[in-house]
Amino acid sequence: AMIGNRTMIDMNAVIGSGAQIGDDVHVGAGAVIAGMMEPACTTPVIIEDGVFIGANAVVAEGVRVGHHAIIGAGSVVLHDVEARAVMIKAPAEKIRERTVDDEQRLCINQTLRKKEVGDHFFDETMD
């Protein structure tokens, strides 16, 4: 798999070997991103930059998820997802576009990615 910068992959997530994941993506615990090499698939899973994939969600083989989309927990994505779409259910359906409120709720992921936060945390605990 190809995994971008500042991407977070939570515990028990499965990333197929042919998957391509962009920068600043969050893959929730137990999520499955297909992308198996055997049997070979002509179209890999592509997760563009800034996507949030909830816990236990599944992105099927050959799907492209557009930048800054949100895939809800437990959703099963069988078809391509537009940029900034919010998808839920199994099979996944678009319910709306990503909003400013979504950005604020997801900002914790950006905070956790910053090296300064980790350094500050470790500095305090080392005293």
Please identify what each model-predicted range represents.
Residues A1-A19:
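Internal active-site segments that recognize and position negatively charged phosphoryl groups
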